[in-house]
From Swiss-Prot:
Lipidation (GPI-anchor amidated serine): S247
Signal peptide: 1-17
Native organism: Marssonina brunnea f. sp. multigermtubi (strain MB_m1)
Xref: Pfam families: CFEM
Recorded domain comment: The CFEM domain is involved in heme-binding and contains 8 cysteines and is found in proteins from several pathogenic fungi, including both human and plant pathogens. The CFEM domain adopts a novel helical-basket fold that consists of six alpha-helices, and is uniquely stabilized by four disulfide bonds formed by its 8 signature cysteines.
Disulfide bonds: C25-C68, C29-C63, C42-C49, C51-C84
Main location as per UniProt: membrane
Descriptive protein name: Effector CFEM6
Length: 271
């Protein structure tokens, strides 16, 4: 038992030493595959368990080919073979990339949008962040590995620049007169969209408009009153002669009647 522990410790130290000699892309592939131990039903650093699943070796092979290129992938694949051989598990065929006749596994990289907390980079804010997941498919088995992420940034709301600004005009019509007044404005920003912002003088503009309308109405009312008064005066002036004439006519009729009566009486006396 003691011998086994010493051997395991020596193997772990050797593996660490060899891993550091690999290119950065290869170290990432090995680290990612080792981190998938729970996916393979293994505990961390259980080489025998990991290497017993051929998908572990396929993952190292395909990841190194995709990340490092075919030429630089050789040392990474060799590391995987040595790693499993030291644990007593031999690898051969397509897992090592030596025998393509067995059919290579298929590596698929997909991006999946994930929620963003709105963190900003300088004056930019994150719009969406996507994870890049590598799926290694061999037969009916699929192994997924998150190999990175990408974030799309856009200008923060506070740093948006206005594209165009248009006034909001209110028009009040009184009779044949119209009173246009700017009561606000609407601004289209590059990111924030359409933001409607009332002007600070909107209230005073409306008050001024109301006063103007009231003043115009007062002038119209005063003019109308003056016109009515003038018309009444003219009618009164015109009515007085008529009344006098009527009165005079009545008087004339009365005078004529009296003359006729006197003439009739005079005629009666003669008769």
């Amino acid at each position: 038992m003691k011998y086994s522990m010493i051997t395991l410790g020596a193997f772990a130290m050797m593996a660490v030493a060899q891993l550091s000699s690999l290119p950065a892309c290869g170290q990432t592939c090995i680290s990612n595959m080792l981190a998938l131990a729970p996916t393979f039903g293994c505990t961390a650093n259980d080489a025998s368990c990991l290497c017993s699943d051929v998908n572990f070796a396929y993952g190292i092979r395909d990841c190194s080919n995709a990340a490092c290129g075919a030429e630089a992938a050789g040392p990474v694949i060799a590391y995987g073979v040595e790693y499993c051989s030291s644990a007593g598990v031999g690898l051969s065929g397509s897992a090592t990339g030596i025998d393509p006749g067995l059919g290579p596994a298929t590596a698929v990289v997909a991006s999946t949008p994930i929620a963003t907390d709105g963190a900003s980079a300088g004056s930019l804010s994150a719009i969406t962040t996507s994870e890049f997941t590598s799926y290694v498919i061999s037969g009916d088995s699929t192994v997924s590995t998150i190999v990175g992420s990408t974030t799309i940034y856009g200008p923060a709301a506070g740093s948006s620049s206005a594209i165009t600004t248009s006034p909001i005009v209110s028009t009040v019509t009184s009779g044949d007169t119209s009173y246009p007044t700017t009561v606000g404005s609407t601004t289209i920003f590059g990111v924030a969209g359409v933001i409607s912002t009332p002007t600070a003088s909107a209230s005073s503009a409306l008050d001024s408009l109301s006063s103007s309308i009231a003043s115009e109405a007062s002038v119209i009312t005063s003019s109308a009153s003056a016109a009515v008064s003038s018309l009444s005066s003219r009618l009164s002036s015109a009515a007085s002669p008529v009344s006098t004439t009527t009165s005079s006519a009545g008087g004339a009729r009365q005078t004529a009647f009296a003359g006729l009566a006197a003439a009739a009486g005079f005629a009666a006396i003669i008769l």
